[in-house]
Amino acid sequence: MAQFTLIIRSGPEATRDPNVYHFPTAQDARDATEHMMRTLLAERADAFDGKAIEIADATGHPIAVVHPYDVMPVRLH
């Protein structure tokens, strides 16, 4: 399984999650990240104001970015 890390980005600031996550594919990592963000936004709508989550591969290079508007219902955009 491939290794992925998550980076919460707010403008130029970046906070790296110290955990390493294992998924079969990058799409599986993105799907899990979208699900997690959707769950957190349902609990607290302002949880990701101005922030995004970067998914990085084992080398630390970002391979995908998930923004709140990617997972919000259309009526909240």
What are these regions, as identified by a protein language model?
Residues 8, 15, 30, 62, ...:
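A broad, structure-centric signal for solvent-exposed, well-ordered loop/edge residues
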Residues 15-25:
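A short, exposed loop/beta-hairpin motif centered on an aromatic-Gly-Thr core
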Residues 25-45:
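A short, charged, amphipathic alpha-helix used as a generic interaction element across diverse proteins
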